[in-house]
Curated annotation (Swiss-Prot):
Fe cation 1 binds at H61, E62, H96, E97. This is Deoxyhypusine hydroxylase. It is found in: Cytoplasm; Nucleus. It comes from Cryptococcus neoformans var. neoformans serotype D (strain B-3501A). Pathway: Protein modification; eIF5A hypusination. Fe cation 2 binds at H218, E219, H251, E252. Its EC number is 1.14.99.29. It comes from the Eukaryota. Catalyzes the hydroxylation of the N(6)-(4-aminobutyl)-L-lysine intermediate to form hypusine, an essential post-translational modification only found in mature eIF-5A factor.
Length: 361
């Protein structure tokens, strides 16, 4: 969607994202970010890049993601600096996202730096660079030039979906650790393409949570957020609750649960007892998110992700779908609840807020 905003509206979005007042809740900054993503253009790239000075790894990781999704080569120097991390200010989660964003933009000039950091000491960074190189090389190939993205999923994926196949074959490739990560990612996204209603595909993806790569596990959780399938809820709960799980996986699991915004479906076999970490407490998924949002001993990234996820949940279940930037909206009272699309809950809410502004071109 192409969006035109006035200078005053752009200034409001910028101030919200960059927390100029000093007291903007994190979830409002996230929504401003995705509203800016809908606007696009060089000025947005500059605003989002400025946000990378923020101390929150969670926000910086999301900023890097958006820079990649904007597909604007103006972001390449910024993303390269984040990956290089000369001052040591960016954690591996942020650097990984910068590498993935370079892959999303797909510029051939990014290949040297990505190949360099395929030797990085951090596994998530190494693996992301490997996948990003694979994506750019694929995009530049004859096969890649002829490939068409799945219109059902409005995102630039780290890897293109593999050729259509049956679920057991794709599951085998997904779990085959002897295959290159890029190939396994292609199987992952091909399984995603079966959609939220395919319990078999969701369960095949959930089997990937046993993989030894945190990067791999976090991508599955992200896909579950895209799909919003109730069948993924037990496995996502397990990842969020596991204190030994990597923070980046728990972060994606939390936000996926917030975007799904339901307690799932009743078991087809009531006699099957779920493992304790997959069971819902009284109050359901929202109670779990609220618990981890205030846990003093929870990692900051996990705690903040749950706070954002609670906002997603409340948005998805709100009759009027609250827009934190109400002052921008000329048609607030005319908004209608939109159907879920295959993207994250935060992006859905941001798109609705942009639509409410009545300025979509």
């Amino acid at each position: 969607m192409s969006v035109q905003v006035s200078p005053e509206q752009m200034a409001t979005l910028k101030a919200t994202l960059l927390n100029t007042p000093g007291n903007v809740p994190l979830h409002e900054r996230f929504r401003a970010l995705f509203m800016l993503k809908a606007v696009g253009g060089d000025e947005v790239v500059d605003i989002v890049s400025e946000g990378l000075k923020d101390p929150s790894p969670l926000l910086k990781h999301e900023l890097a993601y958006v820079l990649g999704q904007l597909l604007n080569t103006r972001a390449l120097p910024t993303l390269s600096r984040v990956l290089e991390n000369p001052t040591g200010e960016h954690c591996s989660m942020v650097r990984h996202e910068a590498a993935e964003a370079l892959g999303a933009i797909g510029a051939e000039e990014s290949l040297p730096i990505l190949r360099k950091y395929m030797q990085d000491e951090n596994r998530e960074v190494r693996e992301t660079c490997e996948i990003a190189v694979g994506k750019i090389e694929f995009d530049l190939s004859e096969e890649g030039k002829k490939a068409n993205a799945n219109p059902d999923f409005p995102t630039i994926d780290p890897a293109p979906s593999a050729a259509p196949s049956d679920i057991p074959s794709l599951r085998a490739d997904l779990l085959n650790t002897s295959l290159p990560l890029f190939q396994r990612y292609r199987a992952m996204f091909a399984l995603r393409d079966f959609g939220a209603g395919s319990k078999e595909a969701v369960e095949a993806l959930a089997d990937g949570f046993r993989d030894g790569s945190a990067l791999f596990r976090h991508e599955i959780a992200y896909i579950f957020g895209q799909l919003s399938s109730p069948y993924s809820i037990p496995s996502l709960l397990s990842r969020l609750r596991d204190a030994k799980e990597d923070d980046m996986v728990r972060h994606e699991a939390a936000e996926a649960l917030g975007g799904i915004a339901s307690d799932g479906v009743e078991s087809e076999n009531p006699e099957v007892v779920l493992p304790e970490d997959e069971r819902l407490p009284e109050g359901g998924v929202l109670a779990v998110l609220r618990e981890w949002a205030v846990k003093a001993d929870a990692p900051t990234v996990v705690r903040e992700s749950c706070q954002v996820a609670i906002d997603m949940w409340e948005y998805e279940n709100s009759a009027d779908q609250f827009n934190p930037l109400d002052s921008l909206s000329a048609k607030q009272e005319e908004r209608e609840k939109t159907e879920k699309v295959n993207t994250t809950g935060m992006e859905r809410s941001a798109h609705a807020a942009v639509a409410a502004m009545g300025i979509a071109a």
